[in-house]
Amino acid sequence: MFIVIEGIDGAGKSTQARLLAEWFKKKGYDVVLTKEPTDTAFGKLIRRLVLTGGKEGIIDGARISHEAEALLFAADRAEHVHKLIKPSLKTGKIVISDRYFYSSLAYQWARGLDLEWLIDLNRFAVRPDLVILLDLPVKESMKRINGRSIKTEFDKIAELQKKVRENYLKLAERFPEMRIVNALASVEDIHNDIVALVEHELLKR
């Protein structure tokens, strides 16, 4: 079973992915909790490149092309899929990922790239059984992001977040595996909503 948690910055993806993994573990499932960019050498390189103000920070929309950025993330994802996700699913594990190719579609589409090209670029990526989209108003997103000590360059502009949120909602209409959860609720309520979805959509099949 493969579940992905998506949403704009500040939506609480990492927290909810962790809570869901803990819920599955308590039920006796073997769980793999992962994220994108990954913790591989390639993923760490990308993560470092995305950090604002870093000496090696190149992804600012000026120093490399948006196409190159999309290809970098897709390359990390290819490693992720072939070395972790597919092998884990093959052995019957539950895989939960904090972000996946939907993030690339939402963000890079917001940067002006063609959606169909982005979908084709990520066609190798195995489709999840369920994608939880944590939907958060941009105003609340910016409030939460501003409280962080480290900001990625994706966090800089509210206008980008607005486009990304709109794109996520459009993607939810296109991809049948996506379900929307209100991320303005409390952490506990959001977790309960996700568990209810998992039980309804996956465990009772």
UniProtKB/Swiss-Prot annotation:
Gene3D superfamilies: P-loop containing nucleotide triphosphate hydrolases. CDD domains: TMPK. One of its GO terms (molecular function) is dTMP kinase activity. It catalyses: dTMP + ATP = dTDP + ADP. The lineage of its organism: Archaea, Methanobacteriati, Methanobacteriota, Thermococci, Thermococcales. It holds the Pfam family Thymidylate_kin. GO terms for cellular component: cytoplasm. InterPro entries: P-loop_NTPase, Thymidylate_kin-like_dom, Thymidylate_kin_CS, Thymidylate_kinase. ATP binds at G7, I8, D9, G10, A11, G12, K13, S14. Belongs to the thymidylate kinase family. This is Probable thymidylate kinase. It is an enzyme of class 2 (transferase). It comes from the Archaea. Its EC number is 2.7.4.9. Keywords: ATP-binding, Kinase, Nucleotide biosynthesis, Nucleotide-binding, Transferase. It comes from Thermococcus onnurineus (strain NA1). One of its GO terms (biological process) is dUDP biosynthetic process. Disulfide bonds: none annotated. The gene is tmk.
